[in-house]
Amino acid sequence: MAHKKAGGSSRNGRDSAGQRRGVKRYGGEFVRAGNILVRQLGTKFHPGKNVGLGRDYTLFAMIDGIVAFEYKDKTRQQISVYPIPAQE
């Protein structure tokens, strides 16, 4: 009688999809109003000039302009969007 004992079942073998967090637009890039700049957990980056903060701490541009990463103080980093001066 060629029998084989039942093997145990593995308790591994699962993986969740990533949440696509991180910086979406970098310093010096041109953005349009409403563009998402950063997706984050908590305020790793704080909103600066012309940048809004969403319910889930997403930072987004409130005007068309150029992105700038700055330091509020020694530890806190902020992101601002500055308008492009009008060309004559």
Swiss-Prot record:
User: What are the entry keywords?
Assistant: Ribonucleoprotein, Ribosomal protein
What top-level branch of life does the organism fall under? Answer: Bacteria
Q: Which SUPFAM superfamilies does this chain map to?
A: Ribosomal L27 protein-like
The UniProt entry, under PANTHER family, shows: LARGE RIBOSOMAL SUBUNIT PROTEIN BL27M (PTHR15893:SF0), RIBOSOMAL PROTEIN L27 (PTHR15893)
Lineage, broadest ranks: Bacteria, Pseudomonadati, Thermodesulfobacteriota, Syntrophobacteria, Syntrophobacterales
Q: What is this protein called?
A: Large ribosomal subunit protein bL27
What Pfam families does this protein map onto? Ribosomal_L27
From which residue to which does any coiled coil extend?
A: none
Record's GO cellular component terms = cytosolic large ribosomal subunit
Q: Which family does it belong to?
A: Belongs to the bacterial ribosomal protein bL27 family.
